[in-house]
C-alpha cells in the first residue's frame, strides 16, 4: 500500500537482476476497504493506485526505454502516513545489461502527475509526453488540474559522410 516504489528488473524468471536506489511513482489517489467489507474485528485497509510505467523506443534505436514519473512530496520521507505530492519529474531510463541509466529527465514540475501518456498530440509526426497535472489539492486551495505536454528534444540523425 505504499505510493512510492523502487524499480525492479527481473530476467524472465523470479531472479531479481536489478533494484533502483531511487523511488519512483507516487499518487494521492487511494481507496479504502470499509469495515462492512472486512468485518468489525479487522482494521480498515487502504491502498494507493500506482501510476503506470510506460515503455517506448523514443530515440529510435530499436530498444524500448522506460518512461516513469517521480512525484515528490513536500514532507519527504519524514511522515510516511502523509501522502501529499506537490511536484514531479518525468524520467527516461534505459537498461544497459547491468542497470538502469538516465537518458534524460524533465525539469521539476509544479504539481503532481496524476496520469501520463506518450502521444502525438499536435499531429506533427513526433511523440510528446501528455500529462494530467494536479496543481493544487483541497484544503484552503480549491483543486485545480491541467493537461500539458512536453516535446522531446531528440537528436537528429547525422548527415551521411561526403556531403548531401
Which positions does each model-derived feature cover?
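Beta-propeller-forming repeat regions
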Residues: 1-164
Amino acid at each position: 500500500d505504499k505510493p512510492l516504489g523502487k524499480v525492479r528488473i527481473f530476467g524472465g524468471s523470479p531472479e531479481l537482476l536489478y533494484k533502483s536506489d531511487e523511488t519512483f511513482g507516487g499518487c494521492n489517489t487511494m481507496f479504502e476497504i470499509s469495515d462492512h467489507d472486512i468485518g468489525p474485528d479487522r482494521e480498515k485497509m487502504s491502498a494507493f493506485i500506482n501510476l503506470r510505467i510506460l515503455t517506448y523506443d523514443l530515440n529510435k534505436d530499436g530498444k524500448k526505454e522506460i518512461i516513469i514519473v517521480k512525484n515528490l512530496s513536500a514532507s519527504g520521507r519524514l511522515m510516511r502516513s502523509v501522502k501529499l505530492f506537490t511536484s514531479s519529474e518525468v524520467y527516461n531510463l534505459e537498461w544497459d545489461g547491468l542497470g538502469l541509466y538516465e537518458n534524460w529527465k524533465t525539469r521539476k514540475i509544479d504539481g503532481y502527475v496524476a496520469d501520463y501518456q506518450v502521444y502525438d498530440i499536435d499531429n506533427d509526426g513526433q511523440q510528446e509526453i501528455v500529462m494530467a497535472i494536479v496543481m493544487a489539492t483541497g484544503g484552503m486551495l480549491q483543486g485545480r488540474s491541467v493537461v500539458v505536454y512536453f516535446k522531446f528534444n531528440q537528436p537528429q540523425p547525422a548527415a551521411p559522410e561526403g556531403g548531401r
